Amino acid sequence: MRALVLGGGGLAGIAWETGVLTGIGDEAPEALRVLVDSEVLLGTSAGSTVAAQISSGLPIDELFARQLSAAEGAHEMNPGVSIDEIAGKFLEAMLPPEATREQKLQKIGVVAVAAATVSEPARRAVIEHRLPSHEWPRRELRVTGVDIATGELVVFHNASGVALVDAVAASCAVPGVWPPVTIGEHRFIDGGVISTVNMAAVTDCGAAVVLVPAGVHTASPWGTGVAAEIDAFPGSTLAVFADAESLAAFGPDLLDPACRGPAARAGRDQGRRESARVADFLGL
């Protein structure tokens, strides 16, 4: 099986990934078709939105147009919290160094619960509007989140008994920015706090194409970085990291709705540049 892995990266990440796929389709339509039809779609945080959107059957051109639409952007919220503020809270939660990863993630969960954010229903309404369909597709769509009680990664899918909107909302619940998502007796935060790509969730696949809305040298608090995580995948991989032009287009705040248009356009340009490499990897 082959997986299309869509990484986390805020509103900029949603726009960029949509743009990259659109750009690949501009130059290599068959490569786009094969990517979208991958046996497994894995989405983390921003990537969960894109994975759910493309699995809905809505054409990529329409999804791209939504990223450029001011009317669509008006449905998004600007949390008014800087990435630096969030990073500071995370660093505090990472102490003491001898704590296990799960213990540190539990502390991040405490930060998330204590943060002043919009209400869960208000945030859920934003996610509802993003998704063309609120039903799980019949195909294999996987969405990552973190259970704040255990600090463990949870992979939602169509047999989890969880509504798609709730799964995506959980995966996009950046701690300290958006409220944790309550599902039954559990509360969940962004799957990206463990990894922006969570390659461990697709180890049953023999190949993976990975879109990462971050630079290739992006570090991770849990290891050597996203690039190393992808390199360690047991199957074959092709990773597309945001290049310098795309990173510049993102601007200073990945959560600011104003970044959507520039990030989408930059992603489309990069997708065109990457299309031949992607097609070659897919054997086209």
Predicted regions and their residues:
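Patatin-like phospholipase
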Residues: 1-44, 49-284
